[in-house]
């Protein structure tokens, strides 16, 4: 499978034999993040042109999953976790423990590579910000978002997600 690869190269560009060879020879790691946190991060990074978070969310919902940006598209439609046997699923917020394990498995020195992820003040601030932004949404938008990300919420354990019922 010696084709020119770019960071955007998708498995669909390869034939079945090449796909099986790649999936069998790589350690497959999937990094996941709560869908609502992904929306907030995208909005804060200015990727949405909407003036308010509520109108940004409405733009996302109006775009649907087929026209959705990779920044907020449901993970299940991007990464196919039911079709690809991932070796590791690393959840945002648990990087220190999980990346340490991955580096150890790869035979790399863990302590010298990993930065400290200990700023609980940042986590608290992000939680507060999430609560504020979630409160901007209408009941209808909250229901639509839960439906939009239904398969992500079912496939991954986002137990503290604002979108979980």
Write out the residue ranges for each language-model feature:
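Membrane-interface amphipathic segments in extracytoplasmic regions
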Residues: 1-165
């Amino acid at each position: 499978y010696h084709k020119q690869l770019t960071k955007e190269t998708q498995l669909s560009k390869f034939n079945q034999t090449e796909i099986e060879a790649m999936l069998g020879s790589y350690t497959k790691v999937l990094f996941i993040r709560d869908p609502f946190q992904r929306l907030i991060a995208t909005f804060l990074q200015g990727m949405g042109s909407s003036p308010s978070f509520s109108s940004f969310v409405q733009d996302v919902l109006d775009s649907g999953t087929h026209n959705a940006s990779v920044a907020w598209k449901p993970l299940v439609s991007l990464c196919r976790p039911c079709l690809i046997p991932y070796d590791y699923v690393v959840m945002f917020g648990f990087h220190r423990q999980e990346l340490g394990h991955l580096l150890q498995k790869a035979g790399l020195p863990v302590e010298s590579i990993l930065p400290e992820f200990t700023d609980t003040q940042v986590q608290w601030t992000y939680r507060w910000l999430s609560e504020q932004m979630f409160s901007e949404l209408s009941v209808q938008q909250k229901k639509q978002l839960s439906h939009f990300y239904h398969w992500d919420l079912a496939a991954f354990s986002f137990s503290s997600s604002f979108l979980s019922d």
